[in-house]
Design a protein with these regions (language model features):
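Long, His/Glu/Asp-enriched segments that create or flank divalent metal/ion-associated functional microenvironments
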Residues: 1-180
Length: 180
């Protein structure tokens, strides 16, 4: 529905901002019910190297309160386009790179850094122009990341307990305890 339309809309804008274009498609899927309890809130699965399977971005719907509708656009930009799917697909499709660099070794800090940048790119290229609630979700996610920095300092310097850290995150971000 809306997330697929969102993905199509931002994909159409990508040539205006990037020379390299991902050829692999991405599908948005629900995390299978039988693994929901232990699965992350959202995650990405690479497209098959031979092109036989598109990339997939999975959303965990075990508790829809963890992912209110207004937060899904930013999660989608993070996981799909211009996020993980875009970055990983371009690497996989690159000519002349050894397989170990293009598809085998992933660097989490680089990939997550790119995905956070992708959220910002989406905002900068106007992805939220007609979606004020979606932009609110983007800003809430930025606040969440800033709050994690405070929590890190609280735990390591101020000797906060785990409970104090969670209480802070809930009070500042408005997220549910179960999502932290």
């Amino acid at each position: 529905g809306d997330l697929n339309k969102q993905t199509v809309a931002i994909t159409e804008k990508m040539p205006l901002y990037f020379g390299a274009q991902a050829r692999a498609k991405v599908e948005i899927k629900r995390v299978p019910v039988y693994i929901e309890a232990g699965a992350a809130g959202g995650y990405y699965q690479n497209a098959a190297l031979d092109g036989s399977r598109p990339g997939a971005y999975y959303i965990n719907l075990r508790d829809t309160g963890e992912w209110p509708r207004f937060s899904l656009p930013t999660l989608t930009y993070h996981e799909a386009i211009p996020g993980h799917h875009w970055q990983i697909s371009i690497a996989q499709e690159a000519k002349g790179l050894p397989l170990i660099r293009s598809a085998i070794l992933g660097f989490v800090s680089y990939g997550e850094g790119w995905a956070l940048y992708a959220e910002q790119i989406a905002d900068e290229i106007g992805a939220y122009e007609n979606d004020p609630a979606g932009r609110l979700g983007y800003l809430r996610d930025a606040l969440f990341r800033a709050a994690r920095l405070v929590v890190d300092t609280g735990i390591h310097h101020r000797k906060w307990t785990r409970e104090q850290a969670i209480d802070y995150m809930v009070s500042v971000t408005g997220k549910q305890r179960s999502s932290l």
